[in-house]
A protein has these predicted regions:
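Short amphipathic alpha-helical segments with coiled-coil-like heptad repeat character
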Residues: 56-70, 206-216, 412-414
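Extracytoplasmic/secreted envelope proteins and their assembly/folding machinery
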Residues: 47-54, 58, 81, 85-92, ...
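Intrinsically disordered, low-complexity linker/terminal regions across diverse proteins
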Residues: 259-262, 281-285, 309, 349, ...
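Noncatalytic, helix-rich "gating/capping" subdomain that lines the substrate-entry/channel surface
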Residues: 95-379, 383
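Short, Gly/Pro- and small/polar-rich lid/capping loops
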Residues: 26-41
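Surface-exposed patches in mature extracellular/periplasmic domains of secreted proteins
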Residues: 63-69, 98-101, 213-221, 392-407, ...
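Gram-negative bacterial Sec-dependent N-terminal signal peptides
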Residues: 1-23
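Active-site-surrounding "flap" and adjacent substrate/cofactor-binding loops of secreted or lumenal enzymes
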Residues: 31-32, 48-120
Length: 473
């Protein structure tokens, strides 16, 4: 179904100024302002608002607007994202911005756009990953290799992350959650309604292992799906995993090793570069002993085949068309309902944005968000903060003590508009126009090691969770 805000929001988006959405990269320039006003043609006034408000507000637009073949939904936020995508394309296909970052984002885009080279290389870019996997001789070594998953194409049966400690928001913490599934969630393995998709997934595994020249693709695929099904049975549901209290279980690595034996936790953490970590937050805690036991019980050949498939699956977007097409047929069409693959330039834009989003954003801001526009919005927000303070003062039902606390909370408000005050430093990142698969791993490694290095530092309040070219930034 289409995802669309009600027509009342249309005026806001029209005021934002939408440029023509064509297939060609637009000329790089300044802000573009489109038509102003409320688009009443998006409504369907033949329907009473009280009977069906969605049709009343959006019925005209809904009837006239098909979902593009390369998307699974569409709405005004998608329109804005399409415009930003075209603008970034113009930046990446134009002359590089001065400096090393400008050269790097162009190299990343060029690497992805070189489809001919990708087809010549085939599976060659992942040969080192598969060679390292074939060299594994013990389950302890396998756990160490899985530890590399945040910064490589490798995968793991437990997912590791670094973020703000939810119980101590001035610090960062390492969190570990359940993982190991190649399908979207446990229901795809356990519910009969997903049986066809599970079967398609197993066929997909055969295809990918065959393309990667892994031994016994048919037998390995069955073993992999059986292994993941056992993990699914042990895993928490999505609803359970959203409980902030149940998913906060701090432990030391030694305590975790006793709590969930059967998995080499210290080698796993060392593989992730977390050699000095003495505290981790365990998410779905009751699943951990079960998943660790499943790992301990699995043959090493199954674990290696499982890892091989997930390496290929993670790397597929950066390999030859055979890998790309096989992945899209299952992950795009079968699992997501997306009829057509996105154009290569769109995927290349996403690649550059994903790897060096702030470097792209810095150029984007210079082209499309002039300082005077930011100054005006900053001034407007300051007035809103003042007005909010005045509203607090005028509340009859709020006590003086509560008002004091409300003002203290208001004073701590951090306003972030348009782009960060401190841009990310990409000087340590190496990018090559000749190897997009290596670039993809370099992007992951750069971000992960950046997180590891700041683990014992205070939380950076200036950091942004999105790039300037992201809709809603």
């Amino acid at each position: 179904m289409k995802h669309v805000p009600v027509a009342a929001a249309l005026a806001l988006f029209m005021a934002a100024g939408l440029a023509s959405n064509t297939g060609a990269a637009p000329a790089v320039g300044g802000p573009v302002t489109g038509d102003w006003g409320f688009d009443a043609t998006g409504m369907d006034t033949s329907v009473r608002a009280g009977d069906d408000f969605f049709k009343y507000a959006n019925g005209g637009w809904d009837v006239r607007t098909p979902i593009p073949a390369d998307k699974t939904g569409y709405g005004l936020d998608y329109v804005l994202a399409d415009q930003a995508e075209l603008r970034v394309r113009g930046i990446l296909e134009g002359a590089p911005a001065p400096g090393a970052d400008g050269a790097k984002i162009h190299a990343a885009y060029a690497a992805f756009m070189d489809e001919k080279r990708a087809n010549v290389l085939g599976a060659t870019p992942i040969a080192p990953d598969l060679a390292a996997l074939r060299a594994v001789r013990t389950k302890t070594e396998m756990a160490a290799l899985m530890g590399r998953s945040p910064m490589s194409f490798e995968s793991a049966i437990f997912n590791t992350g670094i973020g703000v400690d939810q119980k101590a928001p001035d610090k960062y913490a390492v969190s570990i959650g359940q993982g190991g599934l190649g399908l979207p969630n446990r229901d795809y393995y356990l519910q009969p309604s997903f049986a066809a998709k599970k079967a398609a997934y197993q066929t997909y595994i055969v295809t990918m292992l065959t393309l990667a020249h892994w031994q016994d693709p048919q037998g390995s695929a069955k073993a992999i799906v059986d292994f993941e099904t056992r993990i699914a049975e042990a895993s928490w549901t999505r609803a359970e995993s959203r409980d902030p209290d149940k998913t906060f279980n701090p432990m030391s690595p030694a305590e975790l090793a006793k709590f969930a034996p059967g998995f080499a936790w210290r080698p796993f953490l060392n593989g992730a570069g977390l050699t000095g970590v003495d505290r981790v937050i365990v998410r779905q805690n009751t699943a951990f002993p079960k998943i660790a036991a499943i790992y301990a019980d699995a043959p090493l050949t199954t674990l290696k085949a499982w890892e091989a498939f997930h390496v290929v699956d993670a790397a597929a977007p950066y390999l030859s068309d055979a890998f790309v097409d096989a992945q899209f047929d299952v992950r795009g069409k079968t699992l997501s309902g997306q009829p057509s693959q996105r154009d290569r330039w769109k995927r290349a834009v996403a690649f550059a944005n994903g790897g060096m989003g702030e470097a792209v954003g810095r150029v984007y801001v210079a082209k499309y968000f002039p300082p005077d526009a930011k100054a005006k919005i900053d001034a407007l927000v300051k007035e809103l903060v003042v007005a909010l303070g005045q509203r607090i003062d005028g509340l009859d039902w709020m006590s003086a003590e509560t008002k004091t606390k409300a003002h203290a909370k208001l004073a701590q408000l951090t306003v972030k508009i348009g782009y960060p005050s401190v841009w990310r430093d990409y000087s340590a990142l190496k990018v090559s126009a000749a190897n997009m698969a290596a670039d993809a791993e370099a992007f992951d490694r750069f971000e992960w090691m950046r997180d590891v290095k700041r683990l014992h530092k205070p939380v950076d309040r200036t950091e942004w969770g999105m790039t300037p070219q992201t809709v809603n930034a």
